[in-house]
From Swiss-Prot:
Transmembrane segments: none annotated. Belongs to the succinate/malate CoA ligase beta subunit family. Keywords: GTP-binding, Ligase, Magnesium, Metal-binding, Nucleotide-binding, Tricarboxylic acid cycle. GO terms for biological process: succinyl-CoA metabolic process; tricarboxylic acid cycle. PANTHER family: SUCCINATE--COA LIGASE [GDP-FORMING] SUBUNIT BETA, MITOCHONDRIAL (PTHR11815:SF10), SUCCINYL-COA SYNTHETASE BETA CHAIN (PTHR11815). This is Succinate--CoA ligase [GDP-forming] subunit beta.
Length: 378
């Protein structure tokens, strides 16, 4: 379940992450009143469940309350990637000295939470992963031991982040506590800002909650706004898997958030552009794979699909059966490449032998193949 930026910031603040003061406005008049209340420069930010708001014109600075009114008026009602902006966050602008990226996801293969840090914050992290993968530093956290301040300080040093070491470490520990506390599947701060006076603040934030854990958080479940979500994200949620719509033309299906994120990075690195994040989870049966393909192929932007599976509790032959069902029902009208490894790998290959699905032994070969088939980035 996706949260709006202001909701993500409220959660982070609850766990001790510093965030700029901000309030939600539904009208230009409300935006003006909030700006008057703050009495300083503000940023007006569209609240929709998609990325790329800044590029679409959904983030604007305002020096005066009247400007806040005008900028909010321009943003409210705007269509960003198929979603209408119905509210904006009016937040105090921060004086930026440095911008970093910090994000947490679950790596199912390693049974660890992975912390990603980069000195290149404030930009699309997927672009950084594609163009400069060495700029993203990854650290695995044992959830049984937790994440301790001395480990956070060591990670900050290894990633080369500059600023108050202790403050940065405290923010990372608080981010992890928030991630764990609300059962998130993704928690990101981008940018994590070092201000000109040496402060640390989360200028933007993203949290995706694990739908399977919402029963433990009825207060958070009530925040769901179905009308604010992409229709495909709603459908995927109904099927029980994590799906996030992205900007590209290559559908991505994998098992485990870590593997899916790696696959997104890989496709970007070889010149492609992912159309989505879709994690079928562990132990997925054929019907789950079939439903995942249904969702991905409903996206008109998708020109081809890359299925990347590492079989542990997920059996590769079950994945193959789901693909075969989609073939038999005529769903696979776009090229599909697959890389499968692990449990029942050979059985999967035998099942798919002679089928119009392209099998590759490694992820990099599969990524290069699908990018070539769809003609590169969208």
């Amino acid at each position: 379940m996706n949260l709006h930026e202001y909701q993500a910031k409220e959660i982070l603040a609850r766990y001790g992450v510093p965030v700029p003061p901000g309030k939600v406005a539904y009208t230009p008049e409300e935006a003006k009143r909030i700006a008057e209340e703050f009495g300083k420069r503000v940023v007006i930010k569209a609240q929709v469940h998609v990325g790329g708001r800044g590029k679409a014109g959904g983030v604007k600075l305002a020096d005066t309350p009247q400007e806040a009114y005008e900028k909010a008026q321009a943003i409210l009602g705007m269509n960003i990637k198929g979603l209408t902006v119905k509210k904006v966050l009016v937040a105090e602008a921060v004086d930026i000295a440095k911008e970093y990226y910090a994000g947490l996801i679950l790596d199912r293969a390693k049974k660890r939470v992975v912390l990603m840090l980069s000195k290149e914050g404030g930009v699309d992290i997927e672009e950084v992963a594609a163009e400069r993968p060495e700029a993203i530093h990854k650290f695995w956290i044992d959830p049984h031991k937790g994440f301790r301040p001395f480990e956070a300080r060591e990670m900050v040093k290894r990633a080369g982040l500059e600023g108050n070491l202790n403050k940065l470490a405290q923010v990372l520990v608080a981010l992890y506590r928030a991630y764990e506390g609300v059962d998130a599947s993704i928690a990101e701060i981008n940018p994590l800002v070092v201000t000109t006076d040496g402060g640390i603040v989360a200028a933007d934030a993203k949290i995706v909650l694990d739908d399977n854990a919402l029963f433990r958080h009825p207060d958070l479940a009530e925040l769901r706004e179905v009308e604010a979500e992409h229709p495909l994200e709603v459908e995927a949620s109904n099927y029980g898997f994590a799906y996030v719509k992205l900007d590209g033309n290559i559908g991505i299906i994998g098992n485990g958030a870590g593997l899916v994120m790696y696959t997104l990075d890989l496709v970007n690195r070889v010149g492609g552009k992912p159309a989505n994040f879709l994690d079928i989870g562990g132990g997925a049966k054929a019907d789950v794979v079939y439903n995942a393909l249904k969702v991905v192929l409903k996206d008109p932007d998708v020109k081809g699909v890359f299925i990347n599976i590492f079989g542990g509790i997920t059996r590769a032959d079950e994945v193959a059966k789901g693909v075969i069902r989609a073939l038999e029902e005529g769903l696979l009208t776009k090229p599909v490449v697959m890389r499968v490894a692990g449990t029942a790998e050979e059985e999967a290959k035998k099942l798919l032998e002679g089928k119009p699905v392209y099998m590759y032994p490694t992820s990099i070969e599969a990524a290069k193949a699908i990018v070539a088939m769809v003609g590169g980035a969208a």
